[in-house]
Amino acid sequence: MSGHSKWATIKHAKGAADAKRGQLFTKFIKEISIAAKMGGGDPATNPRLRTAVLKARAANMPKDNIERAIKKGTGELGAVNYEELLYEGYGPGGVAVLVEVLTDNKNRTAASVRNIFTKSGGNLGATGSVAYMFNRKGVIEYDAEVVSEEAIMEAALEAGAEDIATEDGVITVTTDPNDFASVLEALQEKGFESVSAAVSMVPDTYVALDADTTQKALKMIDKLEEDDDVQTVSSNIEIPEGFEMPE
């Protein structure tokens, strides 16, 4: 659930991160496998694989799982036949939504994604309908209660980050997507543990909604993220100040 709110406001979606850890690992396995298939099994010479592995490590995915995913991608543990697709559309309140998927059955995935949009009061759009509103960025987030903003800022800028901002108790480090892996690795080596790390589609501007519409939009995003074929969901929703998702 990237590109629309800080970690502190999206814990309702993953927050339950432990309960959803298996599902999250499944998504990482797909991402690592397809990266290894396309560029080889060595993270040192395959930037996409290196990024995927770093993201998995940041989420505490076991090393054995990562190694098996790489071998699956290189064909050592069977063939990988995932297709990468991008769905674009609008959610409640006119929020722009991008859905990135890895699927072995695009008809199944298209039907599922369309159904979620429709039942949630949104609509799936044509290719290019909302993607122009976003830019791909590396986004690394830290809990401001756990790490020092000053220390993160110094280390991140030294590592080549584009921007560092703190809001609602979350320190957000933004990078060029090509620098994401090296910046994350540099911060990990200095002992900074992120709460989330991903190359995400970040919107140019955000759309403010009332609390009721925000709740509906976030519920739609939750449902999309729960689909096993969906890797990431990005939107331009701006969370109202003081908003809390009902349990």
From Swiss-Prot:
UniProt cross-references to InterPro entries, sorted A to Z: Integrase-like_N, TACO1_YebC-like_2nd/3rd_dom, TACO1_YebC_N, Transcrip_reg_TACO1-like, Transcrip_reg_TACO1-like_dom3, YebC-like
Cellular component per GO, a single term: cytosol
Keywords attached to this entry: Cytoplasm, DNA-binding, Transcription, Transcription regulation
Record-linked SUPFAM superfamilies: YebC-like
Main subcellular location: cytoplasm
GO biological process, one term: regulation of DNA-templated transcription
GO molecular function: DNA binding
Subcellular location(s) per record: Cytoplasm
Cross-referenced Gene3D superfamilies: 1.10.10.200, 3.30.70.980
Family of this protein: Belongs to the TACO1 family.
Database matches in HAMAP family: Transcrip_reg_TACO1
Protein name, per record: Probable transcriptional regulatory protein TDE_1487
